[in-house]
């Protein structure tokens, strides 16, 4: 058609029980929006286009909040001339309050797991839609309420099932091998990153962005801090509704959230590292010569554990962090000790365990590559799911 909807963004407002709608359209016309919950109509609005855009506010007669574990979704029909779009949205807000990460104004401890989006047959391509659903279900069965979608822009279908499940995810971008010492490296990276932000903006499950991971110095050349700062600024300019971590683990330049990676395998040493921080002192950072922890903002250990357990007998070709435990009992004791140290810290708002399932040579998943459980997941869930010190 000559008149059509090119793209649209949704802005939930819980206090007003409204949905802000910003659309880019082609041709002249009137955009009409109708919302439904459980098949019942609960709001409508229309507005004429001006200069190729339409901005309007949709009032809702029924407010159902999208929350962790409860992916309450509204259906939305958008009509512009002959063009009709069937869409959906979730009513949820995120904001930072000191050291806390608030979802709908409630402090929520994020029990995250690293998910790299690998599959034995298709590698980066899931064999079926059911396989995408299963990964969310397996994670939640282990007591996690979300994931770092690690070094991969996941498919929209996966994100849809995260939306349905109320499963919290962090959007990332693959950056392995990027020359962080040269701003010219952004020539291809930045446009692709901005495309990911635009494509996935409306997913309520995405509660934050992280464009880079472990930005080490590149072949002896120092990281260019302006490279990270510029991508952070572009991310925040495009999306004012979500926090952004400039680079996960290191080396931080400007960030809304401070995170570190720590694969210490001794629970006592691991806990001792953060004891001062637990008591209100400084955060110990093993990259202290390159980055300084920011006090008073949300902080978490976004990679830890990575405990090797060779369930399939792969042997010497398999890999995990540190010395693997000799028994499953030893594994569970180590897992509990490491995780307890983070749950009990009133200045930590989240953790992210490495990782959900084995990936190729990496044998540090809680499930095998084929998604078979290595351990009693009820035990893992009990460790993960207990109340954290920072939680409401």
Model features per residue range: what roles?
Residues 134-137, 146-371, 379:
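Substrate-binding/catalytic cleft of secreted carbohydrate-active enzymes
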Residues 1-156, 161, 166, 192, ...:
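Secreted/periplasmic carbohydrate-active enzymes, especially glycoside hydrolases
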